[in-house]
C-alpha cells in the first residue's frame, strides 16, 4: 500500500516506518491490489487513454433517510493536495485567533491552508486541513510551516515538498 515507485510488473517501492525507510516489495499473486501515494507520480497527460464506462442503475430508496439541504463548499484557496504553495500552522501558533494570521498569509500567497494534527486537535482549524500521516499528503513547490514541531507523522505528509520554510520562535 502507499507505493511511491514501480520497478517492474511485480516489484514496488513503498515507505515504511512512517517514511523513515524505503522498502522494495514483490508480489507473486496474479491479481495485485495496490494503493498509490497521491504525490508520488506525475499526472497522466489529458486524453492519454480511454476506459470503459459502465452504466449502473440507481440504488433503491428505502425511505429511511432524507436530504435536508445540499450546499457546495466554496473557497478562494487552492485545493490542499494539489496546491503549488501550502502554508501550514501548528500548535506553536498558540490559539485560534493567532491561526487567523496563518490564514491571512495563505491568502496573500494564494496558497492552500494546512495544519499539523496538534493544531487540529487543539481546535485551531478543521481536520480537512490536516497534513501528515493521518491527514493529506502534499508535495508543493513551497511549503511554509509556522509553529510546527516537525513530528515524523507530519513530515510523512509533506516530505515531497520542493522547498520547505520553517518559522518558529
PLM feature segments, named:
Residues 1-169:
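N-terminal glycine-rich FAD/FM-binding segment characteristic of electron-transfer flavoproteins
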Amino acid at each position: 500500500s502507499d507505493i511511491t515507485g514501480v520497478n517492474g510488473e511485480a516489484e514496488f517501492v513503498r515507505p515504511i516506518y512512517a517514511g523513515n525507510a524505503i522498502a522494495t516489495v514483490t508480489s507473486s499473486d496474479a491479481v495485485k491490489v495496490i494503493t498509490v501515494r497521491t504525490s508520488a507520480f506525475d499526472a497522466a497527460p489529458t486524453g492519454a487513454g480511454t476506459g470503459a464506462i459502465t452504466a449502473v442503475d440507481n440504488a433503491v430508496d428505502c425511505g429511511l433517510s432524507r436530504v435536508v439541504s445540499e450546499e457546495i463548499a466554496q473557497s478562494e484557496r487552492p485545493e490542499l493536495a494539489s496546491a503549488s504553495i501550502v502554508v501550514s500552522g501548528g500548535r506553536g501558533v498558540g490559539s485560534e485567533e493567532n491561526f487567523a494570521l496563518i490564514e491571512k498569509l495563505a491568502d496573500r500567497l494564494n496558497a492552500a491552508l494546512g495544519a499539523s494534527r496538534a493544531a487540529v486537535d487543539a481546535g485551531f482549524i478543521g481536520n480537512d486541513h490536516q497534513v501528515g500521516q493521518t491527514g493529506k499528503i502534499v508535495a508543493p513547490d513551497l511549503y511554509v510551516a509556522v509553529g510546527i514541531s516537525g513530528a515524523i507523522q507530519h513530515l510523512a505528509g509533506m516530505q515531497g515538498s520542493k522547498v520547505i520554510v520553517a518559522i518558529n520562535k
